[in-house]
Design a protein with these regions (language model features):
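Active-site-flanking beta-strand signature of metal-NTP-handling nucleotidyl enzymes
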Residues: 1-2, 62
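C-terminal helix-cap and adjacent tail motif
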Residues: 58-90
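Helix-biased detector of long, well-ordered alpha-helical tracts
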Residues: 2-7, 86-90
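Small-aliphatic-rich amphipathic alpha-helix that forms the alpha element of a beta-alpha
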Residues: 4-49
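Short, hinge-like loop/turn segments at secondary-structure boundaries
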Residues: 51-54
Length: 90
């Protein structure tokens, strides 16, 4: 996903919100999706491969695909319990 170079800083927030909704919409259609920095860490190569001009900032990459039952895709790393990193105050 890109935004024009002259965009205001708030445009990045809007793009992030849009990308989150796109990921949710993909899930609703049965697609797996994830925002991935690895897809945009080389913006010059992304521009060349995708035909994106220098007037756009390469900001967000989203990987899309259909879920699989392969053992590699089933890998799930150990995670910290959410209560150790999140506090919700009423």
């Amino acid at each position: 996903m890109t935004i024009p170079v002259e965009s205001t800083p708030w445009s990045v927030h809007d793009l992030g919100a849009f990308s989150a909704m796109l990921v949710l919409a993909a899930a609703d259609k049965g697609l797996g999706a994830i925002n991935a920095y690895a897809l945009v860490m080389y913006p010059d190569e992304v521009r060349e491969a995708m035909g994106i001009g220098a007037d756009e900032i390469v900001a967000i990459g989203i990987a899309l695909g259909y879920p699989t039952d392969s053992a590699l895709a089933a890998f799930a790393p150990d995670r910290v319990d959410v209560n150790e990193i999140l506090t919700i105050k009423d």
